[in-house]
Amino acid sequence: MNTVPRYAVFGNPVAHSKSPQIHRQFALQEGVEIEYERICADTGGFAQAVEAFFADGGRGANVTVPFKQEAFALSDEHSERALAAGAVNTLILLENGKIRGDNTDGIGLTDDISKRLGVELSGKTVLLLGAGGAVRGVIPVLKEYRPARIVIANRTHTKAAEMAAHFGIEAIPLDELEGGFDIIINGTSGGLSGQLPAVSPKVFEHCTLAYDMVYGEAAEPFLAFARQSGAKQTADGLGMLVGQAAASYRLWRGFAPDVLPVVQYMREL
């Protein structure tokens, strides 16, 4: 019988996921051996795939696109963060056999901005571009930092307005945005196809930090546009990725990994 603790990330597609490399680095820090695999679940077959994984000895799992809402529905109980987001990216198998759902995306983002990058969130004006699951997942934790103002802008304004109403924040149409934002966070997936959010350069005039939730080359179109438009500092989402993974690892194993060396390691791959 295999006694090495097993973990996995579920998604579709999932072959590109860096989670196995990240969690192997965390295990090295803890001084333990773990198995961490990628599992591509079929659309409509997510619940069965998760149940089979846990039945076969799995201890915990990460969940990525497009299954975060399904993971929420699958969970027997939820953290407050997961309840607020309506989405789950971390599944924990409890001793009683039940599955607990959590969402560590918001921690990954806010820790990266406030701790690694040293940018204050409290009292600042924050613009979120996009109104999909990535943005929804981070708003509850972002609100805990008490920014002076959080605004959502999205290509489809009605979607942004609905999300803003749900969380008690603001929504402004993309073409009506003006400057005055301290922190601008791109939560759209446009960079993956080289597309930019349809915002005016003047939106970045007073921007302290422009941040893209995606990482590497996919983040560069937005970050380059932000720099050219006046943003003082830019960052991609690699630190968020490692940070949310570290929070998941801690939930599973009670060990808090050091994020910074793993961000540096992943950057050099």
From Swiss-Prot:
Disulfide bonds: none annotated. It catalyses: shikimate + NADP(+) = 3-dehydroshikimate + NADPH + H(+). One of its GO terms (cellular component) is cytosol. InterPro entries: Aminoacid_DH-like_N_sf, NAD(P)-bd_dom_sf, SDH_C, Shikimate_DH, Shikimate_DH-bd_N, Shikimate_DH_fam, Shikm_DH/Glu-tRNA_Rdtase. Pfam families: SDH_C, Shikimate_DH, Shikimate_dh_N. Its EC number is 1.1.1.25. Shikimate binds at S17, K18, S19, T64, N89, D105, Y215. NADP(+) binds at E80, G130, A131, G132, G133, A134, N154, R155, T156, H157, T158, K159, M213, G237. Keywords: Amino-acid biosynthesis, Aromatic amino acid biosynthesis, NADP, Oxidoreductase. Pathway: Metabolic intermediate biosynthesis; chorismate biosynthesis; chorismate from D-erythrose 4-phosphate and phosphoenolpyruvate: step 4/7. One of its GO terms (biological process) is chorismate biosynthetic process. GO terms for molecular function: NADP binding; shikimate 3-dehydrogenase (NADP+) activity. Homodimer. This is Shikimate dehydrogenase (NADP(+)).
